[in-house]
A protein has these predicted regions:
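Conserved helix/coil segment N-terminal to the catalytic DExD/H
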Residues: 311, 315, 338, 363, ...
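Two-metal-ion RNase H-like nuclease active-site motif
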Residues: 14-24
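Conserved SF1/SF2 helicase motif Ia
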Residues: 322-327, 332-377, 395-398
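N-terminal accessory regions of nucleic-acid-interacting proteins
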Residues: 1-13
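Conserved DEDDh/DEDDy metal-dependent 3′-5′ exonuclease domain
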Residues: 39-112, 120-122, 131-149
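Conserved pre-motif I regulatory segment
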Residues: 270-324
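Interdomain "pre-motor" coupling segment immediately N-terminal to P-loop NTPase/helicase cores
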Residues: 220-279
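Acidic, Mg2+-coordinating catalytic module of metal-dependent nucleases/exonucleases
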Residues: 114-208, 212, 217, 222
Length: 411
C-alpha cells in the first residue's frame, strides 16, 4: 500500500488519503475536488476541469489507501461521490470523519481552533473553493484529534475504551476502529469491557438508576455515537462547554441520554447523585447560600410555595407559579435554570418587556457570584449584543433574558 511515506507515529495517518469536494448546491454536481496524502511530497490530485476525467483519476489515486478521510465526509463527500459513480461506493467501507470525531476529542471550551464547534462544525479554513487546502487541513485536524485521544487514553483510559466500542458498531466503522486501536494499542473492546468502562467513567456523575437502564441498551447499535457524545459532554459538564448544535440535530439521542442520566430524580435514597443534584434545598444552598426556602407563603399543608415551585420546575413539570411581591419569585426560575444548565447544558430563555427588570435580575445573580446570565434587548450597543450572543453560542450563558421584539431577529 505504501504510497505515503511513514512520517507519522500513527499508522492510521500513513494509510489514509484526504478528500475534499466542492459541490454546486443547486445542481448537486461536483465542480472541483482534491485528494492528498499526508506528507507534502506525496502525490496529490487537484481538479477543477473535466470532472469525469478527474473522478477516474481520483479512483486510481485512492487505490492502495485503506481509509479516505474528510471533514463531514460521511454526510457530504461520500454520498456525492457515490451519486457520481457507483465505483466510489467502496470508499465508504472504512472512512474517517473528523467532524464526527471532534466533539469527542475536544469537548471542552475553548474547542479546536480550526472547527466551528458552536455552529455547523465546518472547518475555519479562511479559503473559498480551495479543496486542496481543505484536504490538507483535515490531516492537521485529525492529527490534533489523535493527539487529544492519546492524552485522554493516558489520563482516562476508560473514556477511550468506551469511545472505541461505541463508535465502531456500524458497517462503516473500520476507519474509526483502526484509529482507536492505533491510539489504545488494543483491539476493539467487547460489550462487557465497554460496560465496565462506562460504569466507572460515570460513577457519581449521573443517576445510578438511570445508568443501569442505559447500560442495558449497549447492544443497540443505533445508540453508539449518541452515547459517545453524551459521555463526552458529561465529562465536561458543569462548565461552559456546549454540545455542538449539529450533534443535537443529527444525533438527537445524545441530548436525550444526557437528560435521562443527569436530569431525572429517581427518588432512590441510595442514589448519591440525585440526593445531591436533584434536591431543591441543596440547589438553593449551592447557588444562593440559603439553607431553607422562605416559610411564607405556604400551601394548605404548610409547605413553602417557593420550594414547591422550584421542585416542580426541577422535575420538568409545566406550571404556573403566582407569588406576592417581595416573596422571592426570581429564584423560582433561577434555581431550576441554573440546575438544568449544570446538569445538561440547557439554556433557559426568559422573555420580559422590562429592561430595568432584566438588569436587576442579572445584577442580583452577579452579587451571588453567578455570572452566567445575559440580556438581549434594544438598549444594548452592537458590541454588547454581540458579546451576549457569543456567550450563548459558546456555552457561557445559563439564562438568557430577552425582550419580545428581539425574537424577530434571526441572530
Amino acid at each position: 500500500m505504501n504510497k505515503a511515506a511513514n512520517i507519522s507515529r500513527w499508522d492510521v495517518l500513513c494509510r489514509s488519503v484526504s478528500i475534499d469536494l466542492e459541490v454546486d448546491p443547486e445542481k448537486a454536481k461536483i465542480f472541483a475536488l482534491a485528494a492528498v496524502a499526508q506528507d507534502s511530497d506525496a502525490p496529490k490530485l487537484v481538479a477543477n476541469r473535466n470532472i469525469d476525467t478527474a473522478l477516474t483519476e481520483l479512483d486510481e489515486f485512492c487505490q492502495g489507501y485503506e481509509h479516505v478521510i474528510g471533514h463531514n465526509i460521511l454526510r457530504h463527500d461520500l454520498p456525492h461521490l457515490a451519486a457520481a459513480s457507483p465505483r466510489f461506493v467502496a470508499l465508504a467501507e472504512a472512512p474517517i470523519d473528523t467532524l464526527w470525531l471532534n466533539p469527542l476529542a475536544f469537548p471542552r471550551n475553548p474547542y479546536h481552533h480550526l472547527v466551528k464547534h458552536y455552529q455547523d462544525g465546518r472547518l475555519q479554513s479562511g479559503h473559498v473553493n480551495d479543496p486542496e487546502f481543505d484536504a490538507r487541513l483535515v490531516f492537521e485536524v485529525l492529527e490534533d484529534q489523535i493527539g487529544a485521544f492519546a492524552e485522554l487514553n493516558r489520563i482516562s483510559p476508560d473514556a477511550l475504551t468506551a469511545y472505541h466500542f461505541l463508535c465502531c458498531r456500524s458497517a462503516q466503522s473500520g476507519g474509526f476502529d483502526h484509529l482507536f486501536a492505533d491510539v489504545r494499542g488494543s483491539t476493539k473492546p467487547g460489550i462487557e469491557e465497554a460496560r465496565g468502562a462506562i460504569q466507572r467513567l460515570l460513577d457519581g456523575a449521573v443517576c445510578s438508576t438511570m445508568l443501569s437502564s442505559t447500560l442495558a441498551q449497549l447492544d443497540d447499535t443505533s445508540l453508539g455515537w449518541p452515547m459517545a457524545y453524551a459521555l463526552s459532554w458529561i465529562s465536561v459538564a458543569g462548565g461552559d462547554s456546549v454540545m455542538p448544535p449539529w450533534v443535537r440535530a443529527q444525533f438527537s439521542d445524545a441530548a436525550r441520554i444526557v437528560r435521562k442520566l443527569r436530569d431525572n430524580n429517581c427518588g432512590d435514597d441510595s442514589c448519591s447523585y440525585c440526593r445531591t443534584n436533584n434536591d431543591p434545598k441543596k440547589a438553593l444552598d449551592r447557588w444562593f447560600g440559603f439553607k431553607d426556602f422562605r416559610p411564607e407563603p405556604a400551601d394548605e399543608f404548610g409547605r413553602p410555595l417557593q420550594e414547591l415551585i422550584v421542585s416542580s420546575a426541577m422535575n420538568g413539570e409545566s406550571l404556573l407559579g403566582i407569588l406576592p411581591t417581595g416573596t422571592g419569585k426570581s429564584i423560582c426560575y433561577q434555581i431550576p435554570a441554573l440546575s438544568r444548565f449544570d446538569k445538561t447544558g440547557a439554556l433557559t430563555v426568559v422573555i420580559s418587556p422590562l429592561v430595568a427588570l432584566m438588569a436587576d435580575q442579572v445584577q442580583g445573580m452577579a452579587r451571588a457570584g453567578i455570572a452566567s446570565a445575559v440580556t438581549v434587548n434594544g438598549m444594548l450597543s452592537l458590541p454588547e449584543r454581540h458579546d451576549a450572543l457569543d456567550k450563548v453560542r459558546l456555552g457561557d450563558a445559563a439564562i438568557l433574558l430577552i425582550s419580545p421584539e428581539q425574537l424577530r431577529s434571526v441572530s
